[in-house]
Structures are given as structure tokens and as C-alpha cells.
Amino acid sequence: MYITCLDVEGVLVPEIWIAFAEASGIPELKKTTRDEPDYDKLMRWRLGILKEHGLGLKEIQATVEKIDRLPGAREFLDELRTFSQVILISDTFTEFAAPLMKKLGYPTLFCNSLEVADDGEITGFKMRVEQSKLTTVKALQSIGFETIASGDSYNDLGMIQASKAGFLFRSTDKIKADYPQIPAYETYEELLGAIKKAMEEK
């Protein structure tokens, strides 16, 4: 039995931190896991910038409310779910993701949680498990699922490489050049076709 595991930001919705960097006028916050493979280091750096500028959860949530899904993302998910179980696996946080899940038709999402002070300052974060994407696909495999995975960033490579089939989607030129063995696609139609084909192969 197959289950498809998808990254969220950059695949189905725009990058939240890039949108917030633009809304807040803080260009440093545009750095994502496409640029920095160490997520823990990236998040601590982000929290330092938020503190420095006196910004907290409320300001980020106001930006998230205005973000829409990427064109075609909802239709892609709806079509994919007609022939495969689907789980979205993201390093984002429940507190950011909820409004976006509504726009995607409430798919199943595995993500993380923030530690927030009474005044709204984000003081820390709690990762569900170490290497959550890779750990999740391995856990699914341990209970009898064949996994198919797709994402755009460094932190997706573990689940992509550990799955029966894995694909890069709208990734960077550098990641595609560094991992030429991983098929890379730019459109939802191509990705749907690749997932279907992988499920047909014994």
C-alpha cells in the first residue's frame, strides 16, 4: 500500500518566512532550508532576528492569513488523493500552518510547535522528532507502507532518498545539480504522472 509524503512550503504554498520578510521589510528572514540545511540553526537565527525587531507570533500569523496556496495546489492534492493516501510533512509549526490547511482542503499535516510567551514573543520551538521527515517515512515503512516523497529543499532529501520513489519539485538549481540522480519536476501535472508511474511499478 502506498502513501505519498509531501513537503508543504515551496511545494503547495509559498514560503512563509519569505512572505514575512517582505511584509516586515527584514530581508535577512528570506533565508530558508533551500539555503541553510541545518534547520535548528536556521530557526534559532530567525528567532534572534524576531526578538531584535520586537516581532512575535501575532505579526507572523497576520502575514500567513494573507498567503494563498500556490496556483493549482488544491487541485493537485485533490487529484492525488483519489489514488493515494497523502500526508504533508513539514518543518513548519501548527501555529503558522492552520490557515493554510483550510485553503488546501484540510489535508493531514505532520509538523512542529512553537513555544510562545504570554506577550506573543516566540521563545523557542519543539520539534516533533529529530529529522522529522526521514523519521516519519521510516515509521510508515515499518507498518507496511511503501512511501513516495517529494519536496524542494535540503531537509526533504532524507525522505526522498529513503522512499521507493522520490522527486524534487521546483527545487533550486544547486540542489538539482548536487543530486542529479533524483528526478526533478516543475509542474503538478508532471509530479502527478511520476507518482502514478511509481505506484504502477512493482
Predicted regions and their residues:
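Alpha-helical substrate-recognition element adjacent to the catalytic core
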Residues: Y2-S113, A117-D118
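Alpha-helical segments flanking ligand/cofactor-binding loops in enzyme cores
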Residues: D78, K138, L157-G158
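Acidic, Mg2+-coordinating phosphoryl-transfer loop and its flanking beta/alpha structural elements
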Residues: V86-D91, F145-E186
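Short, well-ordered alpha-helical microsegments
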Residues: T94-A98, D156-L157, L192
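Short, acidic/turn-prone active-site loops that include or flank metal/cofactor-
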Residues: S113-V116, S171-I175, E189-L191
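Short acidic-hydrophobic, aromatic-tinged amphipathic segments that line or gate anion-handling sites
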Residues: R128, I182-L191
